[in-house]
């Protein structure tokens, strides 16, 4: 599992909310 990629995607999701 690529945690850095998950973290970056998570940040983008939070921005989109």
From Swiss-Prot:
Expressed by the venom gland. GO terms for molecular function: toxin activity. The keyword Secreted applies. Keywords: Amidation, Antibiotic, Antimicrobial, G-protein coupled receptor impairing toxin, Immunity, Innate immunity, Mast cell degranulation, Membrane, Secreted, Target cell membrane, Target membrane, Toxin. The modification Leucine amide is found at residue 17. GO terms for biological process: defense response to bacterium; innate immune response. Its main location: secreted. Most of synthetic analogs show a decreased antimicrobial and hemolytic activity. Belongs to the MCD family. Mastoparan subfamily. Antimicrobial and mast cell degranulat peptide. Has activity against both Gram-positive and -negative bacteria (B.subtilis (MIC=25.8 uM), E.coli (MIC=7.3 uM)). Shows mast cell degranulation activity (EC(50)=15-26 uM). Has low hemolytic activity (IC(50)=80 uM). Its mast cell degranulation activity may be related to the activation of G-protein coupled receptors in mast cells as well as interaction with other proteins located in cell endosomal membranes in the mast cells. This is Mastoparan-like PMM. It comes from Polistes major (Horse paper wasp).
């Amino acid at each position: 599992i690529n945690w850095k990629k998950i973290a970056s995607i998570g940040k983008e999701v939070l921005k989109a909310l």
